[in-house]
């Protein structure tokens, strides 16, 4: 309040055109311009004299710029429809040839990009295949090592086999001796014609006596 009062007094005493803009700590704005001019006129005069004039656009210039941008957008949309195979009846022969060439160029670019992606996928699959083969070989090696270790554990030391072989031979001989002792003693029995018992008549049946 006091500052604006001082501004009024200064404008009257100095017969000057004065403009004051104040922003309080709460964000409120206060302004004063010495009559009969307004704050807008003071700001415009300041910009002209200081060279900080804001660009002023003519309405016709703005309209022309908007029209140009709209035409550009319409042309781009029409081109997109032509690439999609739409609204082709409005095209001339030369425009159709140009469109065909552009489509061929686009197709070649798409095909090249597709082949590039396929090659990348193929390279990735080959790398995965090599990794799987390496893992398979490593797993096979581990299995072979484990199998060899198991076979070594099952094998017996040859010196131990010789030691057990002596006991086996002794037991076999002992069993054989026992079988010989238990078998009956068979003596040969020979018939002697001169033996008296074979010539004793009493031993013959009565019906065979002469």
Swiss-Prot record:
Protein's name according to its UniProt entry: MADS-box protein AeAP3-2
Any Pfam family hit: SRF-TF
Residue stretches making up the MADS-box domain: 1-36
GO CC aspect terms: nucleus
Expression sites (tissue/organ): Expressed exclusively in the carpel.
Summary of the function given for this chain in its UniProt record: Probable transcription factor.
Ranges of residues in domain K-box: 59-149
Keywords recorded for this protein, A-Z: DNA-binding, Nucleus, Transcription, Transcription regulation
GO molecular function: DNA binding; DNA-binding transcription factor activity; protein dimerization activity
Subcellular compartments: Nucleus
PANTHER family documented for this protein: SERUM RESPONSE FACTOR HOMOLOG
Organism: Asarum europaeum
InterPro entries given in the database record: MADS-box/MEF2_TF (IPR050142), TF_Kbox (IPR002487), TF_MADSbox (IPR002100), TF_MADSbox_sf (IPR036879)
PROSITE patterns: K_BOX, MADS_BOX_2
